[in-house]
């Protein structure tokens, strides 16, 4: 049921979407040891910095921080980020291959967004990060 909800919705053109702001987010890990692991909701925020649109997961022990880029498909964005842990300094994509994260981002409604991480380095075969606007 949780996975069906996270994967529901029809992607919309991302350039019509304002992702900036505070979100609640959670990760669903699929495959490897267990068929699915659903983590609780944590805080995330998206904002513009001097470089681009940026995402930070600000709660939980496993966090991500990175940037969004345009894709040839108008209904998705590319996310390049890096995994870091609660007490670690934020990392940038490309600094440590084992921590690099790549995902496609999909705008589903005014208050819903999803990142899909194919073949993450740790713990699963695919991660889905679900966002709901606070």
Language-model segments: residues:
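Extracellular structured ligand-interaction cores
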Residues: 20, 41-43, 102, 128
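Proline-rich intrinsically disordered, low-complexity coils
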Residues: 11-13, 35, 74, 120
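Central antiparallel beta-sheet cores of small beta-barrel/beta-sandwich binding domains
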Residues: 25-100
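Edge beta-strand at a domain terminus
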Residues: 2-5, 94-104, 110-134
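Amphipathic/hydrophobic helical signal segments and adjacent flexible N-terminal regions
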Residues: 1-18
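A short, structured loop/turn motif at beta-sheet edges
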Residues: 16-20, 47-50, 68-77, 105-112, ...
């Amino acid at each position: 049921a949780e996975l069906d909800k996270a994967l529901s919705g029809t992607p919309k053109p991302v350039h019509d979407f304002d992702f900036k702001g505070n979100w609640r987010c959670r990760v669903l890990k699929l495959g490897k040891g267990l068929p699915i692991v659903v983590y609780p909701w944590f805080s995330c925020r998206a904002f513009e910095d001097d470089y681009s649109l940026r995402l930070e997961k600000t709660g939980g022990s496993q966090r991500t921080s990175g940037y969004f880029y345009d894709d040839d498909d108008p209904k998705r964005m590319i996310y390049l980020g890096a995994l870091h842990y609660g007490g670690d300094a934020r990392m940038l994509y490309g600094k440590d291959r084992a921590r690099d994260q790549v995902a496609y981002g999909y705008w589903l409604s005014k208050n819903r967004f999803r990142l899909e991480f194919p073949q993450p380095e740790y713990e699963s075969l695919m991660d889905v990060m679900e966002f709901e606007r606070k």
